[in-house]
């Protein structure tokens, strides 16, 4: 009996903000690796999720939502998104079925037209939000001035519809290759990064619009106190004292709520009880200061 071949490769997930890229990655990996929020631009780094089967390994690069940059952080995010295209063995372009094709989609498509030889998939996400008879017109709208899609997949990342079939298909397009990561590894980011992202997710979900894009999280300490408990200290970084006041909340209610929700997710991730301490610190205009960006982990050499 001939030995079965092992396939592997890198898949870039790209799309404008809030089309469901992080939801799709988390659906595939089965853990919260990329944060999810209804706020735009929640994904800031090229988070790698790893999907492994007996005969294949796919490393997913979930890119920041493409938008017109307003500051140095925005420039970093957009540069990060498009650099992924040059690292990938396949590209998934995700669009929102419930929204018409827009200028953000056109901008991405113009860049995809420059890509040659790499398979490019069109993923019509959130099909659970539309009537079945609307689907054909949506697909046709993305054929205009666009590359020839290798495959077109209607999916629902939230419900999981058509996602297993999508995975089988992309594996069929990959070449024979090595297993880059251990079978039980879900991401190449360290625990500190993932824990920080879980905390930032709760800030995004619970605070007002003026706060989210100004928030970063630094994990100051992770220490195992005993076999069943982990002590974590984290700093939530904002740009203005008013934002600090919002995150702390009246009599500390908001920061307590953020900590409680984050702790539950971190405990699921770590498999142990967690004692989480959080502080809020003001770093004026950190998004426009290259040194601050590097200190807070937005270093292009690492991504």
From Swiss-Prot:
What's in the keyword line of the UniProt record?
Cell membrane, Cytoplasm, GTP-binding, Membrane, Nucleotide-binding, Ribosome biogenesis, RNA-binding, rRNA-binding
Which residue stretches belong to region G5? 155-157
Pfam families named in the record: KH_2, MMR_HSR1
Its GO CC terms?
Answer: cytosol; plasma membrane
Q: Where is the stretch described as G3?
A: 62-65
- PROSITE patterns attached here? G_ERA, KH_TYPE_2
Q: What GO terms describe the biological role, i.e. biological process, of this protein? A: ribosomal small subunit assembly
Q: In Gene Ontology terms, what is one molecular function of this protein?
A: small ribosomal subunit rRNA binding
Region entry G2, spans: 41-45
Question: What subcellular locations does the record give?
Answer: Cytoplasm; Cell membrane
Q: How does it sit in the membrane?
A: Peripheral membrane protein
Era-type G domain residues are 7-176
Q: Where does GTP bind?
A: 15-22, 62-66, 125-128
What are the boundaries of the region G4? 125-128
Start and end of every KH type-2 domain? Answer: 207-284
Keyword Mitochondrion annotated: no
Q: Which NCBIfam families match?
A: era, PRK00089.1, small_GTP
Q: Subunit structure of this entry?
A: Monomer.
Q: What does this protein do?
A: An essential GTPase that binds both GDP and GTP, with rapid nucleotide exchange. Plays a role in 16S rRNA processing and 30S ribosomal subunit biogenesis and possibly also in cell cycle regulation and energy metabolism.
**Protein name, per record:** GTPase Era
Q: What organism does the record attribute this protein to? A: Leuconostoc citreum (strain KM20)
């Amino acid at each position: 009996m001939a030995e079965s071949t092992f396939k592997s490769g890198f898949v870039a997930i790209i799309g404008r903000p809030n089309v469901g890229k992080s939801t799709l990655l988390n659906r595939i990996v089965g853990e919260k690796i990329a944060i999810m929020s209804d706020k735009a631009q929640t994904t800031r780094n090229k988070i790698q999720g790893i999907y492994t089967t007996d005969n294949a390994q796919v490393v997913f690069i979930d890119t920041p939502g493409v938008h017109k940059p307003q500051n140095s952080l925005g420039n970093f995010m957009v540069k990060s998104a498009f650099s992924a295209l040059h690292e990938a063995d396949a590209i998934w372009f995700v669009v929102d079925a419930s929204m018409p094709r827009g200028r953000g989609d056109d901008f991405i498509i113009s860049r995809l037209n420059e890509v040659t030889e790499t398979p490019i998939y069109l993923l019509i996400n959130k099909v659970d939000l539309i009537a079945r008879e609307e689907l054909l017109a949506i697909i046709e709208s993305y054929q205009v001035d666009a590359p020839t899609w290798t495959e077109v997949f209607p999916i629902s990342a939230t419900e999981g519809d058509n996602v297993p079939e999508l995975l089988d298909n992309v594996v069929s397009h990959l070449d024979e290759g090595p297993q880059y990561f251990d079978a039980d590894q879900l991401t190449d980011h360290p625990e500190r990064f993932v824990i920080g992202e879980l905390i930032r997710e709760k800030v995004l979900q619970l605070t007002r619009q003026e706060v989210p894009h100004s928030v970063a999280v630094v994990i100051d300490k992770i220490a195992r106190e005993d076999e069943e408990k982990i002590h974590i200290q984290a700093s939530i970084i904002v740009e203005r004292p008013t934002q600090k006041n919002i995150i702390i909340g009246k009599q500390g209610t908001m920061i307590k709520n953020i900590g409680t929700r984050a702790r539950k997710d971190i405990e699921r991730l770590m498999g142990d009880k967690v004692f989480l301490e959080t502080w809020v610190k003001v770093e004026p205009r950190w998004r426009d200061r290259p040194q601050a960006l590097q200190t807070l982990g937005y270093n292009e050499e690492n991504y």
